[in-house]
Amino acid sequence: MSFLTSMFKTEKPVIGMLHLRPLPGDPLYYPGGSVSQVVEAAKRDLEALQRGGVDGILITNELSMPYEQHVSPSTLASMGYVIGALSHDLSTPWGAEAIYDGDATIELCAAVDAQFTRCNFCGAWAGDL
């Protein structure tokens, strides 16, 4: 049995993407917003994904645009906070990604005990955006 099959309990897992709303420090962060609003939106999305039957969940800062090759400390701190707030509600294998920053992704995943990740780490900076 492969590592992925043992983690997800299926040979072809469906991994749902939980895109966090813009975080503090992001250009698109809502004026007058709060991290608790980001947490509440993430909880709603998490519930919908798990209810929908996904085999795993990847939590990302997809809306931290424009993407940077080095994620800011405020983004990492905010992601860690939001993931901590979601941790008791996660019932499927889950991972995290700090978009386009492999080092920050590994640091974040180690800090929050993520079970897997996806990241750009090999020096190829190509994408669809």
Located regions from the model:
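Alpha-helix-loop-beta-strand connector modules within alpha/beta enzyme cores
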Residues: 10-11, 16-17, 68-96
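Hydrophobic faces of well-ordered beta-strands that scaffold small-molecule active sites
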Residues: 14-18, 57-59, 94-97, 117-119
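Active-site mouth loops of central-metabolism enzymes
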Residues: 19-44, 94-101
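Conserved anion-binding
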Residues: 20-23, 104, 108-129
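Generic hydrophobic/aromatic pocket-lining and core-packing "Φ" positions
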Residues: 46, 83, 105-106
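Non-catalytic positions within long, well-ordered alpha-helices that form the structural scaffold/packing
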Residues: 47-50, 109-110
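Glycine-rich, proline-tolerant flexible connector loops at the mouths of alpha/beta enzymes
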Residues: 50-78, 123-129
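Ligand-binding beta-strand-loop-alpha-helix segment within the catalytic cores
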Residues: 86-87, 93-96, 100, 108-110, ...
